Amino acid sequence: MNKNEALNLVYENILGEHSILIQLRRGEGLNEDRFNELVTAMQFLIVEYKDLDIVPKKLALSFVDISNYFYFNEDKYSLEEQNLIEDAVQKISQLANELFDYW
């Protein structure tokens, strides 16, 4: 994976027309393959940008208030699915914090 591939995976899975977020809102559940792809891309970008003071604006935009986008009508999912989604949100938030950690 290179930097551009990782960035595109983040953009597709967070901002894209068929993003993980849109799939969840449609009641399609968490696509674990796409989620794992997103996590791998984020981990790559954490290493790529760890010593830099700047990141692409679109990358930063991808994670602005990201956790708010995961809250929706919970009646769509069973308690087990809700817990899985909540774990995914926490993982994405944790990785975003690492990605943008300035200190």
Question: Predicted segments — roles?
Answer:
Residues 1-35:
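Short terminal alpha-helical segments
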Residues 17, 21-27, 49, 73-77, ...:
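Secondary-structure edge/capping motif, primarily at the C-terminal ends of alpha-helices
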Residues 47-63, 83:
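Short, charged early-sequence alpha-helical segments and their helix-coil boundaries
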